[in-house]
Amino acid sequence: WGALGHATVAYVAQHYVSPEAASWAQGILGSSSSSYLASIASWADEYRLTSAGKWSASLHFIDAEDNPPTNCNVDYERDCGSSGCSISAIANYTQRVSDSSLSSENHAEALRFLVHFIGDMTQPLHDEAYAVGGNKINVTFDGYHDNLHSDWDTYMPQKLIGGHALSDAESWAKTLVQNIESGNYTAQAIGWIKGDNISEPITTATRWASDANALVCTVVMPHGAAALQTGDLYPTYYDSVIDTIELQIAKGGYRLANWINEIHGSEIAK
């Protein structure tokens, strides 16, 4: 996701993080701000663009070597790669964020990575190898020539919300939380975190990746890539996917909160 999506994931998470876990996370991040997760949600994207951080680029995705739209699947052993992927990163930073042998800066970095990667995993094209996760599928959206990946990350969410400031994200998150509390997500939200377990991070994160990857076949490119490269993706394609984008942002926030609550719970139990 882009800045708007990541901040919205973080604001949704802030709603569901327990007060005790919130204090713990604020302590790690050195922030008592009401945007303590949202304000650092895109740090990992900024970091990977620096010379010091370019090593981390592969951690933002897992390249599922499947065959959309005919066949979508994730295989951790097949797809992760020697330089690591989102799944291995979530496992690593889940361990590091509460490793007492590491420095407070290591803990803060680990939490910043977790906030970002758990969000990225719900963007279907971050769980797909085809055309570099859609980066090489050149399309037209709302009169602009861009690529399918950036439309999913940034331009379709911004079209829905109308901006990408923290205030826009906070407002979107409130709507998504309402949908979780008493709307069309209420019945399904418990399923978003079913079986999630910080002691089984590879299994859990692989399930998250598989959940989003399946949408590449059913929602992102159900008729293949070529079908998306004629005409403008707005409004017909946009209308067909925007509900899924909202759902995936909500999922990311709900899962992130549960993950932080679990990590904090395991800290207390030590």
UniProtKB/Swiss-Prot annotation:
Disulfide bonds join 72-217, 80-85. A divalent metal cation 2 binds at residues 15, 126, 149, 153. SUPFAM superfamilies: Phospholipase C/P1 nuclease (SSF48537). Residues 116-164 are annotated as: Substrate binding. Substrate binds at residues 1-6, 45-51, 60-63, 73-78. The record marks 45, 48 as: Important for catalytic activity. A divalent metal cation 3 binds at residues 1, 6, 120. Binds 3 divalent metal cations. Glycans are attached at residues 92, 138, 184, 197. Keywords: Disulfide bond, Endonuclease, Glycoprotein, Hydrolase, Metal-binding, Nuclease, Secreted, Zinc. One of its GO terms (molecular function) is nucleic acid binding. GO terms for cellular component: extracellular region. InterPro entries: PLipase_C/P1_nuclease_dom_sf, S1/P1nuclease. GO terms for biological process: DNA catabolic process. The keyword Cytoplasm does not apply. Its EC number is 3.1.30.1. It catalyses: Endonucleolytic cleavage to 5'-phosphomononucleotide and 5'-phosphooligonucleotide end-products. Its cofactor is Zn(2+). It comes from the Eukaryota. It is found in: Secreted. A divalent metal cation 1 binds at residues 45, 60, 116, 120. Belongs to the nuclease type I family. Hydrolyzes only single-stranded DNA and RNA without apparent specificity for bases. This is Nuclease P1.
